[in-house]
């Protein structure tokens, strides 16, 4: 072995180690189903929906759906907490620094706890609701018909397919119908939240857990 070959043999592992370490550090961890009530939670496994239970792990990029009356809570390390409302179907994000979860239908409440420089978003066929830092927000979608985003605390930004954006601060919401322009500004959410029997009933930031639409005494 000549000197050049020997040097290459030393340098190659030295170069690869930091790269491998960086790749391993960036790999997101699996999430956990920390709560499940009112029905079933299923994941798509080899083209078949299979029921999963509280305490089981869920992986990045997995497709999940809840039963007609089920509410499931999922904790994702370095991202936050997701609460799937009844009759919801989602695909969990794949990138730890830009964790975009796709929602085909239903309602998804997101509580983020993101490291600096990271972003999380809920993507629907009509719009994308994105957040950086810490926020509590809920997104409701009716497939390709409409989408609604409501913010409990912090700020989120909703972007339509044509690139138009609207900020949604704490205590406000925005609703977008398919084929319609994004509203110029968000509206106060109080009139909607005070109505029982709405899709917002399961939101844990404003409503009593399992309270069937009952608002928390300190929700304002």
How would you describe each model-predicted region?
Residues 1-11:
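Bacterial N-terminal signal peptides that target proteins for export
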Residues 9-19:
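Bacterial N-terminal signal peptides
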Residues 26-220:
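Flexible, surface-exposed loop/linker segments and immediately adjacent secondary-structure boundaries
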Residues 19-25:
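Sec/Tat signal peptide C-region and signal peptidase I cleavage site
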Residues 1, 25-26:
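Absolute protein N-terminus
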């Amino acid at each position: 072995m000549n000197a050049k070959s020997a040097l290459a043999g030393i340098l190659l592992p030295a170069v690869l180690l930091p790269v491998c370490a960086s790749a391993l550090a960036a790999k997101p961890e699996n999430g956990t189903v920390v709560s499940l009530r009112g029905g079933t939670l299923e994941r798509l496994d080899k083209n078949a929906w299979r029921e999963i239970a509280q305490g089981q792990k869920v992986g990045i990029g997995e497709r999940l759906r809840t039963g007609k009356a089920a509410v499931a809570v999922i904790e994702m390390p370095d991202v936050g907490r997701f609460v799937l409302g009844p009759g919801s179907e989602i695909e969990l994000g794949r990138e730890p620094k830009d964790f975009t979860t796709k929602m085909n239908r239903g309602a998804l409440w997101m509580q983020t706890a993101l490291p600096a420089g990271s972003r999380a978003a809920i993507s629907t066929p009509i719009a994308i609701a994105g957040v950086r830092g810490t926020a509590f927000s809920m997104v409701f979608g009716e497939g390709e018909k409409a989408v609604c985003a409501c913010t409990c605390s912090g700020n989120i930004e909703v972007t339509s397919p044509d690139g138009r954006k609207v900020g949604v601060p704490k205590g406000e919401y925005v609703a977008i119908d398919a084929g319609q322009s994004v509203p110029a500004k968000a509206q106060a959410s109080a009139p909607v939240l005070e109505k029982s029997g709405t899709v917002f009933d399961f939101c844990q930031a404003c409503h009593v857990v399992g309270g069937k639409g009952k608002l928390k005494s300190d929700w304002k």
